[in-house]
A protein has these predicted regions:
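N-terminal capping segment at the start of a domain
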Residues: 1-16, 170
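Acidic/His- and Gly-rich active-site-bordering loop/insert found
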Residues: 31-33, 37-87
Length: 241
């Protein structure tokens, strides 16, 4: 069970991916996806259904064997997102030495200090042109290699680092993406990463920059979930604070 949980967490760093993975599991276990805009049709005891909304939430239910007035019903709720940093549009910020950082905004209420000095990556969704110009397509993206880092200054530049330092959401937690090596990369580094990932993971597709209409991407922990302790009784998952 714990291995299945850790595998699910590794595959679900953001809500879009969590919803897809939950939907796949439900479908494999006899649940039927429904469209809330269409009639449900005949329903009988034991039938199982699920519906998704905006690719970011999912609702599953099973029809009971007794009337609700007699047996009542049970409800279980959980959220499938977690505090993180959302990548802003036109996010690339070129700094001294050709270093590129990404401009972000806080999503939720993260404990910002826990995001420093660890390998991070990107996950979310990318909207691309569809065959019908009026029907764009949404693709999920999860870059599984370490890609970014939010770095602390060396201690001789920040002697108060161990005394508790107020962090600016606009300045101190901008992740480093890399260094441009040619003028052609200026302003295109993030897009190149997105296109490389899409073209390497989606068969028979060759996207270019003009195909990408928008994206909704977030920072995610690149460290795999694991267990630890003498008896492996404690689990380390991902940044969720």
């Amino acid at each position: 069970m714990i291995k299945r949980l850790l595998s699910f967490l590794d595959a679900s760093p953001v809500n879009f991916l969590a919803v897809k993975n939950i939907a796949d599991t439900l479908a494999a276990n006899g649940f039927r996806r429904i469209d809330p805009a269409l009639p449900l049709g005949e329903v009988k005891s034991g039938d199982r259904f699920f519906v998704t909304k905006n690719d970011s939430s999912i609702y599953a239910f099973r029809i009971g064997n007794k009337p609700i007035a007699d047996a009542g019903f049970h409800m279980i709720c959980a959220h499938c997102d977690s505090p993180t940093f959302r990548i802003k549009p036109n996010a690339e910020m070129l700094t001294e030495g050709g270093i590129v950082k990404l401009n972000t905004e806080v999503y939720g209420g993260p404990i910002m200090s826990t995001w420093f000095d660890r390998p991070l990556t990107l996950a979310g969704r990318v909207i691309v042109r569809g065959e019908d110009v009026m029907q764009p397509e949404t693709l999920l993206l999860h870059i599984k290699r370490p890609l970014l880092q939010i770095s602390n200054l060396a201690i001789h530049f920040n002697r108060q680092v161990n005394d508790g330092v107020a962090l600016s959401k606009q300045k101190d937690v901008l992740p480093l993406l890399g260094q441009i090596t040619s003028q052609l990369e200026a302003g295109n580094l993030l897009m190149n990463v997105i296109l490389e990932e899409l073209n390497s993971t989606i068969a028979d597709c060759q996207f270019c920059a003009k195909d990408v209409l928008d994206f909704d991407l977030y920072l995610a922990d690149a460290t795999p979930a694991c267990t630890f302790g003498v008896h492996n009784a404690v689990s380390y998952t991902h940044l969720t604070l």
